Amino acid sequence: RLSAALLKALPYRAALTAAWCSAAFTFHVCRFRRRETLRRIREVFGPDYPARDARRIAWLSLRNMSFNLVEMIRAQDIDRAWIDRHIPAFALYVPQVQALIRRYGGAVITVPHMGNWDLAGWACNQYGIRMFSIAGKQKNPLVNDWVNRQRETGMAILERGSGTLKQIIKLLRSGNALAILP
């Protein structure tokens, strides 16, 4: 909570710098789960994949996750002006999404797993598009509750499970948009 309060109090770029420093320390000094991460990257790309490239993917992934955490912590303060300043092209696509929702009663938006996809939900919320998504449960219940509280600042989160499909259909029929990672 203290770290979250600090990251929220700092100016945005300073908070990102602090997140970068924390990620760099974790990756380069502590090497937390680094061996396992590199093993998994090589499993996907093959044993001949250059070690340098695998390290780069691992580093960028951790760095970007740290940046996403900063945005998640600051989600309650994200307003339309912030969205327009940091994601200038976003407003161009809002009318298209709104038209699809009016025409079909709901929408499914596929989002690549790049960057902070939760930010898409917060941004849509600022433009009046009601979003929801599906998430798995985190192992630590305190972390799970915190992450869901942060995410639900801009969109509803459905926990993956047996009744999820019925909830999805109900929300889509009521004019919501589902953000999903294909």
What is each PLM-predicted segment?
Residues 1-108, 115:
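Membrane-proximal helical "anchor" segments flanking the first transmembrane region
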Residues 76-182:
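Soluble catalytic domains of membrane acyltransferases
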